[in-house]
């Protein structure tokens, strides 16, 4: 009998081992599948899609460094440098000797202007792999960003000692020598860069730029033309060739090249600005004005754009608009004497003599401070000690990325930066194909998943931020399913149709239901908030009509009102009293606080939502927008990175705008 028991036990162990082995093998197969799929996405520049595959690979094997590293590469290409940094750091926690992770993390630090950390990473990488020429090139680039050009040259020398045919090393060394005011040596290196990689557009372009600085216009033009032969869609080459045309006096040819830049790169504010300046110099103010408007739309904090647009309005004798633009310039840079003087002149034209005189006196006080013999002129700018302030008010966006490249890089997409809406339970007849997602974000819970698996498949329920009217095709479906309480089905149907009062009545009947009460409360909070916003909009419309009927020339003081969200807030508080871990209720409460302009309570509510549902991408996104509004950009950018990682593509456009 003992022997029989031991045999049974042996067979049990064998069976258990085979089960465990099959699970391990399956996990490895799935991991490799998603790594391969992600690599294919990376190679085809589908960076956003690759992140999803690497996320899945990490779920199968959270201790394998490869998925983190590749996901970091994808985030880097989406300009999510903080997210990339986190993934490269995680890679090194798992594999402390992985040179490529040090290399890429160093480059990421460099992009974030963390030059000390970048040099530390390159140093560590070179300790592991001292004969890696690419590492020496990357280290040289960081030295250049620190204006340590001699050190940069030494790094490039080492790279060329390892690989004497490395075009990029010659290219970068040539640029470094140009900064060291060794133009002839710089040209020699740039000649070698072209020689060793004839089809390197960058080498032709940079050599042309150095020749341009040396006033060798004819040969510079030849290099730019050759660069365009290799890459006719490169906006930076057209931009540089336009400068060459200007230097040789061919303004019309320069204008054509600038126009080509904006055809390829529609958000290149620097080029719009240059075009506007050229039109202004030609006294074509009517053509300059719309270009300045594009600049202010892209870079609303650029002081020169407002200042020059003000001058353009003045030349067109639109003096009030001119004064308004000079005011914007003054708000951005209060010590801009020229803006005070110009506004003084504009106000004089508007017969505002007192305002004109006050502006003139302010300008004179600024000029006097600049000319104060006892002080340093720079002292006037001491209050703006943070250099990023000047970067913000003087810099113009100019990525020089053409339209085709923008299509694969979601950070360049045009998005309306607005928070995601509240979450409610909606029915949908959409049927995604296997492996595909619905065209909007959805979430599910155990009860909802069980219901979806048991119904007749005419529709499914999902928790979503998509507006209710999107689901009109499924509005009557719940009414036909006997397992759904009639009142809840009626509430959903009325919510989709926009009949708020009927929906509210129906949901109140269901709010204490043991199974459907939670979802009734969620939906009820959304409907109550929507009704409050509708009532506020109607009231504002009535006020606007009464205001337009007034004969007074004075502008009435209109109090900015907020919708009455109290009923919606009370429903959510009641739900949270009985189910404190309901992430979706916390999220909806966060939205109500945000709409009420209670920003810190909104952040707290979103944080609770994330605590109980770490994959709630919209909570990260909305919390990030709230933090941005409060000026907490670093915290916001971390949230945006997480939102993008979880699948919200809009996050990368916001990162591009606020996290660089």
Language-model segments: residues:
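Alpha-helical adaptor scaffolds
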Residues: 304, 311, 526-530, 542-600, ...
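Helix-start (N-cap) detector for alpha-helical repeat units in TPR-like alpha-solenoids
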Residues: 30-32, 65-66, 99-100, 133-134, ...
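Alpha-helical segment of the N-proximal tetratricopeptide repeat
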Residues: 29-60, 73, 77, 107, ...
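Structural signature of tandem alpha-helical TPR/SEL1-like repeats
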Residues: 44-53, 77-90, 112-124, 146-158, ...
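Structural marker of alpha-solenoid helical repeat scaffolds
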Residues: 60, 94, 128, 162, ...
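Canonical tetratricopeptide repeat
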Residues: 36, 70, 104, 138, ...
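Position-specific recognition of the canonical hydrophobic site in helix A of tetratricopeptide repeat
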Residues: 35, 42, 69, 75-76, ...
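Eukaryotic alpha-helical solenoid repeat scaffolds
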Residues: 315, 337-502, 542-567
């Amino acid at each position: 009998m003992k022997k029989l028991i031991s045999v049974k036990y042996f067979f049990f162990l064998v069976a258990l081992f085979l089960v465990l082995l099959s699970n391990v093998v399956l996990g490895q197969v799935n991991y490799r599948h998603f790594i391969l799929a992600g690599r294919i996405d990376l190679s085809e520049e589908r960076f956003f899609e690759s992140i999803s595959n690497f996320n899945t690979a990490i779920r199968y094997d959270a201790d394998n460094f490869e998925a983190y590293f590749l996901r970091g590469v994808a985030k880097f290409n989406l300009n999510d440098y903080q997210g990339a940094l986190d993934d490269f750091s995680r890679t090194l926690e798992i594999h402390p000797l992985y040179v490529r992770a040090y290399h890429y993390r160093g480059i990421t630090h460099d992009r974030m202007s963390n030059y000390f950390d970048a040099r530390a990473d390159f140093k560590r990488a070179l300790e592991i792999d001292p004969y890696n020429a690419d590492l020496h090139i990357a280290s040289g680039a960081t030295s250049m960003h620190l204006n340590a050009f001699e050190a940069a040259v030494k790094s490039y020398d080492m790279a060329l000692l390892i690989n004497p045919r490395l075009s990029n090393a010659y290219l970068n060394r040539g640029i470094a020598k140009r900064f060291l005011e060794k133009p002839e040596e710089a040209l020699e290196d740039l000649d070698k860069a072209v020689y060793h990689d004839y089809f390197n557009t960058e080498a032709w372009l940079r050599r042309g730029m150095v020749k341009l600085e040396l006033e060798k216009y004819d040969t510079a033009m030849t290099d730019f033309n050759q660069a365009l032969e290799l890459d006719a869609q490169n906006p930076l080459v057209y931009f540089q060739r336009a400068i060459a045309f200007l230097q040789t006096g061919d303004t019309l040819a320069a204008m054509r090249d600038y126009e080509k830049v904006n055809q390829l790169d529609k958000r290149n504010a620097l080029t719009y600005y240059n075009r506007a300046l050229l039109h202004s110099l030609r006294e074509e103010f009517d053509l300059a004005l719309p270009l300045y408007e594009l600049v202010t739309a892209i870079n609303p904090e650029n002081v020169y754009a407002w200042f020059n647009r003000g001058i353009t309005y003045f030349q067109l004798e639109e003096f009030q608009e001119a004064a308004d633009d000079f005011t914007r310039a003054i708000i951005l840079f209060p010590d801009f004497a020229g803006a005070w003087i110009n506004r003084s002149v504009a106000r004089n034209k508007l017969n505002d003599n007192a305002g004109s005189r006050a502006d003139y006196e302010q300008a004179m006080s600024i000029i006097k401070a600049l000319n104060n013999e006892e002080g340093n002129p720079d002292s006037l700018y001491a209050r703006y000690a943070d250099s990023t302030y000047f970067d913000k008010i003087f810099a113009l966006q100019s990525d020089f990325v053409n339209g085709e490249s923008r299509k694969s890089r979601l950070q360049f997409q045009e998005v309306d930066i607005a928070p995601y809406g509240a979450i409610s339970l909606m029915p949908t007849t959409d049927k995604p194909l296997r492996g595909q997602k619905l065209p909007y974000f959805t979430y599910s819970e155990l009860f909802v998943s069980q219901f979806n698996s048991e119904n007749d498949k005419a529709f499914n329920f999902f928790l979503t931020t998509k507006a209710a009217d999107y689901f009109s095709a499924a509005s009557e479906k719940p009414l036909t399913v006997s397992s759904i309480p009639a009142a809840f089905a009626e509430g959903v149907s009325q919510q989709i149709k926009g009949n708020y009062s009927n929906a509210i009545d129906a949901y109140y009947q269901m709010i204490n239901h043991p199974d459907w009460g939670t979802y009734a409360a969620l939906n009820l909070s959304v409907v109550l908030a929507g009704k409050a916003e509708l009532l506020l909009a109607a009231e504002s419309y009535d006020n606007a009509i009464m205001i337009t009927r007034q004969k007074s020339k004075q502008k009435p003081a209109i109090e900015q009102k907020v919708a009455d969200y109290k009923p919606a807030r009370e429903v959510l508080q009641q739900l949270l009293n009985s189910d404190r871990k309901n992430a979706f209720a916390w999220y909806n409460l966060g939205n109500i606080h945000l709409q009420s302009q209670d920003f810190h309570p909104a952040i707290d509510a979103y944080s609770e939502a994330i605590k109980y549902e770490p994959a709630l991408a919209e909570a990260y996104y909305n919390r990030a927008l709230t933090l941005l509004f409060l000026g907490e950009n670093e915290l916001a950018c971390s949230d945006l990175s997480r939102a993008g990682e979880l699948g919200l593509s809009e996050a990368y456009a916001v990162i591009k705008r606020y996290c660089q």
